[in-house]
């Protein structure tokens, strides 16, 4: 059960970092 929690936290952290970079620097593809 603890392994599942660690995996969830890891994915959550990656998602937060991804969205932080995504919203801070809007990709040019979205502006097409």
UniProtKB/Swiss-Prot annotation:
GO CC annotation terms, alphabetical: chloroplast thylakoid membrane; photosystem II reaction center
Topology of the protein relative to the lipid bilayer: Single-pass membrane protein
Pfam families recorded: PsbT (PF01405)
TM regions (residue ranges): 3-23
Main location: plastid
Keywords, ordered alphabetically: Chloroplast, Membrane, Photosynthesis, Photosystem II, Plastid, Thylakoid, Transmembrane, Transmembrane helix
GO terms classed as biological process: photosynthesis
Protein localization: Plastid, Chloroplast thylakoid membrane
Function: Found at the monomer-monomer interface of the photosystem II (PS II) dimer, plays a role in assembly and dimerization of PSII. PSII is a light-driven water plastoquinone oxidoreductase, using light energy to abstract electrons from H(2)O, generating a proton gradient subsequently used for ATP formation.
Family per similarity comment: Belongs to the PsbT family.
Summary of subunit composition and partner proteins: PSII is composed of 1 copy each of membrane proteins PsbA, PsbB, PsbC, PsbD, PsbE, PsbF, PsbH, PsbI, PsbJ, PsbK, PsbL, PsbM, PsbT, PsbY, PsbZ, Psb30/Ycf12, at least 3 peripheral proteins of the oxygen-evolving complex and a large number of cofactors. It forms dimeric complexes.
Name of the featured protein: Photosystem II reaction center protein T
Source organism per UniProt: Cyanidium caldarium
